[in-house]
């Protein structure tokens, strides 16, 4: 199924401040399959290029991308998108409370600034993980 999206047009009558940040988005890349335990991919999901076009039209210059529940504990799609977007994007990843310091630093080096906790059905890490995860994230100045 294809969804027709308006990604460009007349300039908005509301001018956004320079440097405005979209602080919550999910991006699905077709080369990354869903993981067991999570929901499926959205029908007619927008891709990276569509999202970038929309941001350009709206005047959004930076973004924070959150790993989607469809990918569960697999951050590969998120890290791919961060590489594609470069300095204009940061990420919120699914981070195990048992992650090694070395693995956590590798995520930070790739643009991860926070850990996702999702207590709804299909979330990779729920609130039962928050105490142990908080110790790891706060020590590295990450958001949770």
Ranges and model annotations:
Residues 2-73:
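An N-terminally biased module of ancient metal coordination in phosphate/nucleic-acid-related enzymes
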Residues 2-4, 72-144:
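Active-site gating/metal-coordination segments in enzymes
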